[in-house]
Regions:
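Hydrophobic structural segments
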Residues: 1-373
């Protein structure tokens, strides 16, 4: 039977908590990682309705995108929604887990799921995230190189764009003198040993380096594994906020708005006034994206689809880019299906029931409003 920690491991192999912004509150909020679970709810946020369903159906874990505790709680009473939910979760031993700004940045995360829902192609991040890259270098007997490369790669090393297990290997001579207390792979205590070694180099996103080192140690033959970590000047290009991609075929504005409405099942779209243009390059940001409008303009996008836009956003950028506010909620909902798909990929979660909480019913009728001058 799956445990809470198995779901956490699956989520954090995809969206490590170390990617989250410093102000964010992610990870396990309540619960015991060793508890057995038969089912899990995936939701944008934990509401009273979510908790009621969990209690009525004996669900032991809820994975949400929005943190249940965002601001510090000074009391645990029924005076507000967050503290009421936390009290209930602790009382009923329901684990609450959150993946927020870390999930925003990863491949197939919040914005990329939105882009995929709209059928975009050649999708890349709109703006860089906060993930630094390291060069991981270790030294090994040649006969161990392949298994070490595989172990490091399985932990997240060696990913460059759409290519996995990227590495460079060079051969040379290593030396060492084992002490009397050492147990060397080869050589004798007190004598200088010279052996042929491979130098294996792989890039690693900084949040994954501890896991890469841990998994490499498990297969490395040396008692003391030598390795170097070198900071790189560029950031991990596959990680970032927002997404930008192409429509398969250019569309006129009314056709594109129909696509957005139908794909996201959102009734009302707020759209900036401006010249009617053909849409080809589309930028998106799941949730609140007004801070990334300049990035969408810089990317040369014809349109930016996001949520939480205000009057002054439409006013300021009406001549620069077409803005479409499809609501915070609707632009984030596609991630729920992606989370379910990712959890199903874990062999440790085979047989686990994964229930999506879509929240309030989304209207499918279509209207759009224009905002701007």
């Amino acid at each position: 039977m799956a445990k809470v920690r198995d779901v956490i491991d699956a989520m954090e192999q995809w969206a490590p908590v170390s990617l989250a912004e410093p102000w964010d509150n992610v990870g396990l909020i309540t619960g015991n990682t060793e508890n057995n679970i038969e089912s899990v709810i995936v939701a944008l946020e934990v509401t009273e309705e979510t908790m009621a369903f969990a209690l009525g159906n004996r669900v032991q874990l809820i994975v949400s995108h929005h943190p249940t505790i965002f601001k510090p709680l000074k009391t645990l009473t029924d005076s507000n929604l967050s503290s009421s939910i936390i009290r209930m979760a602790v009382k009923e031993d329901i684990a609450l887990y959150t993946s927020h700004t870390n999930l925003d940045q990863v491949p197939h995360g919040v914005s990329m799921s939105l882009a995929e829902k709209l059928g975009l192609t050649n999708i890349t991040p709109l703006a860089p995230g906060n993930c630094e890259l390291l060069k991981f270098i270790t030294f090994t007997p040649p006969e161990y190189t392949d298994r070490i490369r595989e172990a490091a790669g399985n932990a997240g090393a060696g990913v460059i764009g759409e290519y996995n297990l990227c590495s460079f290997t060079s051969r040379g001579t290593g030396t060492y003198i084992p002490s009397s207390d050492a147990s060397p792979h080869e050589g004798e205590s007190g004598k200088l040993s010279r052996f042929t070694e491979d130098r294996l180099e792989m890039v690693v996103p900084a949040p994954l380096i501890s896991k890469v080192i841990e998994e490499t140690r498990k297969v490395h033959p040396y008692e003391e594994m030598a390795y170097d970590l070198i900071p790189m000047s560029r950031k991990e290009l596959s990680l970032g906020y927002g997404a930008v991609g192409n429509l398969q075929e250019p569309m006129e504005l009314p056709q594109f708005l129909g696509l957005v409405s139908e794909s996201l099942q959102v009734k009302t779209l707020n759209v900036s006034k401006g010249e009617m243009r053909r849409i080809k390059l589309v930028a998106v940001m799941g949730g609140s994206g007004k801070d990334y409008i300049p990035a969408a303009v810089s990317a040369g996008a014809d349109v930016f689809v996001t949520g939480d836009l205000g009057h002054h956003d439409f006013l300021e950028y009406c001549s620069s880019i077409l803005l479409v506010d499809a609501t915070h909620r609707a632009t984030e909902l596609p991630i729920l299906s992606t989370i379910k798909e990712r959890l199903h990929l874990s062999p440790l979660l085979e047989g686990l029931e994964i229930i999506i909480d879509w929240g309030k019913t989304v209207q499918t009728a279509y209207e759009y409003n224009e905002k701007g001058i």
